[in-house]
């Protein structure tokens, strides 16, 4: 530890103690909050099933920065490079299309064995795994419907895919000793005016009930469902709306996934957390950055990211909220995108843990809104960066932008050689 860091740490300890905050306790709490990194930033959501296929489902990854991962070996190497530069506990979130097999595997036939390499890698890197069925980028999703499809055979294919995915998820949890959160998102919807909005939702309701009919140990597997306002090509009607999935998660007691980009631009998920937690047992968060639409830009340390973190900490939701990231930017170095977004999420959590919440709550309860606002603003100037730097040092990761040197060296030595 350098003398400069020691001095900054001691000063920070004194400054935060003056407002009733124990920074050592804040760092202990931060180590209770893993962030689940999404594998698909590394290859623009291509996967290994059909890497040259088109990305469908009303989502887009824009840009053509060189060096994207082309196979599982490259993707895991890129992830390892990112993991080394991010302090504290992490998880990895996989989609079904990231299976590994020497022969083609239909999505309704995926099995745990197709993900055994990921499990062994996760063990070696001390990571938990989360999972997602992939209900897009497939011939049987080309007309815009999957679990709500009017054709019973096609609908059953997607039901069976999701059921098979749950078995993979439970395998992850059993092998790694930490529950895998499996999130179901489907692109189902219509481009233009829709006459029958009820029937697809009735079919989706019945399909989901069949999907979750097999019981798994919650210590191994947790179901989550995710809504969306619209997607490209499904601007007028989305089967899995917010109201549909809020009702489903409440009535079936599954986890509810809130994606920062899946609502109207004037809505924020930070305001939805406390409301949803009254009715559902768990929340899965997909922290993202929507720019005018669900663009999935890299997460910033901005007001909404901070507000999301603050809601988790202020209400002590550590054991009920699962923090995941969901962005994919192909216009910049993909390893750097992981590092920037994940570090920003962790910085937001740290800042939330350093807030004098008890004091603020007392001011609010007493009606002293002037002091509440004043203290909220003044605490932004407290030396949280020194606490972050100490956290990084203790986890043997760069504290400032020095991590970029490592990414540039990796790009020169590895990424630039990929065609």
From Swiss-Prot:
GO CC annotations, alphabetized: cytoplasm
GO biological-process terms attached to the record: L-lyxose metabolic process; rhamnose catabolic process
Name of the protein described by the UniProt record: L-rhamnose isomerase
Family statement: Belongs to the rhamnose isomerase family.
EC class (word): isomerase
Main location: cytoplasm
Secretion signal span: none
Source species of the chain: Salmonella newport (strain SL254)
EC number(s) from the headed UniProt entry: 5.3.1.14
Cofactor, free-text remark: Binds 1 Mn(2+) ion per subunit.
